[in-house]
Amino acid sequence: MKCPFCNSEETRVIDTRLTDDGHVVRRRRECEHCGGRFTTYERFEQKPIFVVKKGGQRERFDRNKVLNGILKACEKRPVSIEEIENMSSEIEQEVLRSGKAEISSKEIGEMVMEKLKRKDRVAYVRFASVYKEFRDLDHFMDIIRELKDELKKRDRRD
Protein backbone atom coordinates (compact mmCIF):
# COMPACT_ATOMS: atom_id res chain seq x y z
CA MET A 1 0.00 0.00 0.00
CA LYS A 2 1.46 3.36 -1.02
CA CYS A 3 1.78 6.10 1.58
CA PRO A 4 -0.62 8.97 0.79
CA PHE A 5 1.93 11.46 2.14
CA CYS A 6 5.19 10.53 0.40
CA ASN A 7 4.13 7.79 -2.08
CA SER A 8 6.54 5.26 -0.58
CA GLU A 9 5.53 1.61 -0.81
CA GLU A 10 7.28 0.82 2.47
CA THR A 11 4.35 0.78 4.89
CA ARG A 12 3.42 -1.58 7.67
CA VAL A 13 0.19 -2.45 9.44
CA ILE A 14 0.22 -1.41 13.10
CA ASP A 15 -3.39 -2.29 14.01
CA THR A 16 -6.18 -4.36 12.46
CA ARG A 17 -9.81 -4.43 13.58
CA LEU A 18 -13.12 -5.71 12.29
CA THR A 19 -15.89 -3.12 12.00
CA ASP A 20 -19.46 -3.01 10.66
CA ASP A 21 -20.38 -6.36 12.23
CA GLY A 22 -17.35 -8.05 10.68
CA HIS A 23 -18.06 -6.86 7.14
CA VAL A 24 -15.13 -4.43 7.04
CA VAL A 25 -11.48 -4.72 8.05
CA ARG A 26 -9.96 -1.48 9.33
CA ARG A 27 -6.19 -1.27 9.20
CA ARG A 28 -4.03 1.43 10.77
CA ARG A 29 -0.80 1.78 8.78
CA GLU A 30 2.49 3.60 9.24
CA CYS A 31 4.93 4.64 6.52
CA GLU A 32 8.43 3.40 7.26
CA HIS A 33 9.87 6.19 5.09
CA CYS A 34 8.18 9.37 6.41
CA GLY A 35 6.46 8.07 9.58
CA GLY A 36 3.00 9.20 8.39
CA ARG A 37 0.03 7.23 9.69
CA PHE A 38 -3.17 6.52 7.79
CA THR A 39 -6.18 4.23 7.88
CA THR A 40 -7.42 1.88 5.18
CA TYR A 41 -10.65 -0.09 4.95
CA GLU A 42 -11.22 -3.41 3.20
CA ARG A 43 -14.74 -4.29 2.10
CA PHE A 44 -15.86 -7.32 0.13
CA GLU A 45 -16.73 -6.66 -3.49
CA GLN A 46 -20.41 -6.92 -4.24
CA LYS A 47 -22.81 -6.56 -7.14
CA PRO A 48 -23.39 -2.91 -7.90
CA ILE A 49 -26.60 -1.42 -6.56
CA PHE A 50 -28.12 1.42 -8.52
CA VAL A 51 -29.91 4.39 -7.07
CA VAL A 52 -32.90 5.58 -9.08
CA LYS A 53 -33.04 9.36 -8.85
CA LYS A 54 -36.19 11.46 -8.86
CA GLY A 55 -35.88 12.19 -12.60
CA GLY A 56 -35.45 8.49 -13.43
CA GLN A 57 -31.69 8.54 -14.01
CA ARG A 58 -29.65 5.79 -12.40
CA GLU A 59 -26.26 5.93 -10.71
CA ARG A 60 -24.26 3.49 -8.61
CA PHE A 61 -24.89 3.54 -4.88
CA ASP A 62 -22.13 5.55 -3.26
CA ARG A 63 -21.72 5.24 0.50
CA ASN A 64 -19.71 8.48 0.49
CA LYS A 65 -22.72 10.45 -0.74
CA VAL A 66 -24.70 9.20 2.25
CA LEU A 67 -21.78 9.99 4.56
CA ASN A 68 -21.37 13.52 3.14
CA GLY A 69 -25.09 14.25 3.48
CA ILE A 70 -25.03 13.20 7.13
CA LEU A 71 -21.80 15.16 7.72
CA LYS A 72 -23.38 18.35 6.36
CA ALA A 73 -26.51 17.89 8.46
CA CYS A 74 -24.45 17.28 11.61
CA GLU A 75 -22.01 20.16 11.06
CA LYS A 76 -21.40 22.03 14.33
CA ARG A 77 -23.67 19.58 16.19
CA PRO A 78 -22.64 17.34 19.11
CA VAL A 79 -22.49 14.23 16.92
CA SER A 80 -19.13 12.47 16.71
CA ILE A 81 -17.47 11.37 13.49
CA GLU A 82 -17.76 7.80 14.77
CA GLU A 83 -21.54 8.17 15.17
CA ILE A 84 -21.78 9.65 11.67
CA GLU A 85 -19.68 6.78 10.25
CA ASN A 86 -21.89 4.27 12.07
CA MET A 87 -25.08 5.82 10.67
CA SER A 88 -23.76 5.72 7.11
CA SER A 89 -22.52 2.13 7.58
CA GLU A 90 -25.90 1.05 8.96
CA ILE A 91 -27.65 2.59 5.96
CA GLU A 92 -25.21 0.90 3.58
CA GLN A 93 -25.86 -2.45 5.29
CA GLU A 94 -29.64 -1.93 5.02
CA VAL A 95 -29.28 -1.23 1.30
CA LEU A 96 -27.09 -4.32 0.80
CA ARG A 97 -29.37 -6.56 2.87
CA SER A 98 -32.38 -5.48 0.82
CA GLY A 99 -31.08 -7.71 -1.97
CA LYS A 100 -32.38 -5.25 -4.54
CA ALA A 101 -30.44 -4.34 -7.68
CA GLU A 102 -32.02 -0.87 -7.53
CA ILE A 103 -33.21 1.39 -4.74
CA SER A 104 -34.84 4.80 -4.97
CA SER A 105 -33.11 7.91 -3.70
CA LYS A 106 -36.34 8.51 -1.75
CA GLU A 107 -35.84 5.27 0.22
CA ILE A 108 -32.25 6.20 1.04
CA GLY A 109 -33.30 9.72 2.07
CA GLU A 110 -35.95 8.25 4.39
CA MET A 111 -33.34 5.96 5.98
CA VAL A 112 -31.04 8.94 6.59
CA MET A 113 -33.88 11.00 8.07
CA GLU A 114 -34.87 8.17 10.41
CA LYS A 115 -31.29 7.83 11.72
CA LEU A 116 -30.90 11.60 12.16
CA LYS A 117 -34.29 11.94 13.85
CA ARG A 118 -33.11 9.54 16.57
CA LYS A 119 -29.64 11.10 16.88
CA ASP A 120 -30.05 14.89 16.65
CA ARG A 121 -33.24 16.86 15.93
CA VAL A 122 -31.45 19.89 14.51
CA ALA A 123 -29.45 17.70 12.10
CA TYR A 124 -32.71 15.99 11.15
CA VAL A 125 -34.38 19.33 10.31
CA ARG A 126 -31.30 20.45 8.36
CA PHE A 127 -31.30 17.29 6.27
CA ALA A 128 -35.08 17.39 5.82
CA SER A 129 -34.93 21.00 4.63
CA VAL A 130 -32.71 19.95 1.71
CA TYR A 131 -34.18 16.50 1.10
CA LYS A 132 -37.85 17.53 1.23
CA GLU A 133 -37.26 20.64 -0.92
CA PHE A 134 -39.59 22.84 1.10
CA ARG A 135 -41.87 24.95 -1.08
CA ASP A 136 -42.23 27.68 1.50
CA LEU A 137 -41.96 28.50 5.18
CA ASP A 138 -45.34 26.88 5.97
CA HIS A 139 -44.14 23.54 4.59
CA PHE A 140 -41.00 23.85 6.74
CA MET A 141 -43.10 24.62 9.83
CA ASP A 142 -45.31 21.57 9.13
CA ILE A 143 -42.25 19.31 9.37
CA ILE A 144 -41.18 20.93 12.65
CA ARG A 145 -44.71 20.53 14.07
CA GLU A 146 -44.74 16.86 13.06
CA LEU A 147 -41.42 16.36 14.82
CA LYS A 148 -42.62 18.13 17.97
CA ASP A 149 -45.86 16.09 18.01
CA GLU A 150 -43.91 12.87 17.59
CA LEU A 151 -41.57 13.83 20.43
CA LYS A 152 -44.52 14.65 22.72
CA LYS A 153 -46.07 11.24 22.01
CA ARG A 154 -42.74 9.53 22.69
CA ASP A 155 -42.32 11.45 25.97
CA ARG A 156 -45.81 10.40 27.11
CA ARG A 157 -45.00 6.73 26.46
CA ASP A 158 -41.76 6.94 28.46
UniProtKB/Swiss-Prot annotation:
GO BP term, example: negative regulation of DNA-templated transcription
Chain's role: Negatively regulates transcription of bacterial ribonucleotide reductase nrd genes and operons by binding to NrdR-boxes.
Family statement drawn from the similarity comment of this UniProt entry: Belongs to the NrdR family.
UniProt KW Zinc-finger keyword: yes
Cofactor, how bound (note): Binds 1 zinc ion.
PROSITE patterns xref list: ATP_CONE
Ranges for domain ATP-cone: 49-139
InterPro entries associated with the record: ATP-cone_dom (IPR005144), NrdR-like_N (IPR055173), RNR_NrdR-like (IPR003796)
Zinc finger residue ranges, unnamed: 3-34
Repressor listed as a keyword: yes
Keywords (A to Z) from UniProt: ATP-binding, DNA-binding, Metal-binding, Nucleotide-binding, Repressor, Transcription, Transcription regulation, Zinc, Zinc-finger
Cofactor entry: Zn(2+)
GO molecular function: ATP binding; DNA binding; zinc ion binding
Official protein name in the record: Transcriptional repressor NrdR
Pfam family, one: ATP-cone
